[in-house]
Swiss-Prot record:
It comes from Pseudomonas putida. Its cofactor is [2Fe-2S] cluster; FAD. The gene is ndoR. Residues 1-89 form the 2Fe-2S ferredoxin-type domain. This is Naphthalene 1,2-dioxygenase system ferredoxin--NAD(P)(+), reductase component. Component of the naphthalene dioxygenase (NDO) multicomponent enzyme system which catalyzes the incorporation of both atoms of molecular oxygen into naphthalene to form cis-(1R,2S)-dihydroxy-1,2-dihydronaphthalene. Ferredoxin reductase catalyzes the transfer of electrons from NADH to ferredoxin (NdoA). NADPH is also effective but yields only 39% of the activity obtained with NADH. Also able to catalyze the cis-dihydroxylation of biphenyl and phenanthrene.
Amino acid sequence: MELLIQPNNRIIPFSAGANLLEVLRENGVAISYSCLSGRCGTCRCRVIDGSVIDSGAENGQSNLTDKQYVLACQSVLTGNCAIEVPEADEIVTHPARIIKGTVVAVESPTHDIRRLRVRLSKPFEFSPGQYATLQFSPEHARPYSMAGLPDDQEMEFHIRKVPGGRVTEYVFEHVREGTSIKLSGPLGTAYLRQKHTGPMLCVGGGTGLAPVLSIVRGALKSGMTNPILLYFGVRSQQDLYDAERLHKLAADHPQLTVHTVIATGPINEGQRAGLITDVIEKDILSLAGWRAYLCGAPAMVEALCTVTKHLGISPEHIYADAFYPGGI
């Protein structure tokens, strides 16, 4: 049996029942992967022809709604088929690790957000925009996005308290300076594409600011000269945080433009009012040739996906990280 791989037009023989990711790795085919368990979605690829048995949906991959897409680590090859490895020039491979860490600072930028600064016992490699699972106790673990970069002295995480949320309430009540945690990852596909040279749209809603900060800082630090348009949206003034940090970043880097958007209530000078989707539609005539990084609550991310597609961005160039509340 044979597997045809695009876009490099390579043919690889395999035996029925073989795992797709193992076949690719054994034959030196570059593909992004991380957790090897179907959780992170990093090894997603498209089936062009033939059939592949994919158990990813059973592992909670609800975002893989298009039946053409499968997770290579969860896929079994049953017959001749052809696949496409997406963005073959933007492959990232950060083998998943479990690392111990210590909380060195707990900050309260708003009434319902805690900013944790964590010092890890070992280096932790990830791509800007990815996330990791933080385990605070055997019964309290949840994924959170890194707000910084791999070479930062401390990892930064933004955690919003969800009423009735088992993990977030534990964090607010029990996590203090000196608390020991475990970090596992990295996970996620909404990471910075460093070879893209066109404009970037980065949108963060609430604590979705964390991965957006990582992406923007990563682009600036790596020397990317792309124009970057950053929108940070919150519900009201009391939910706004890090605005000065964002505007200082923009002042230091002319290629970066920052807009803070307040959905309800009064606004201050320089702020925008209304829904973030409406503001973006007013500001941008076309997103053709752009890359979009969208992070925040599922409803906001889904609305942004619709708007950005309507403005002309290719769907494969939308990188979305929706903060689903499961297991909170």
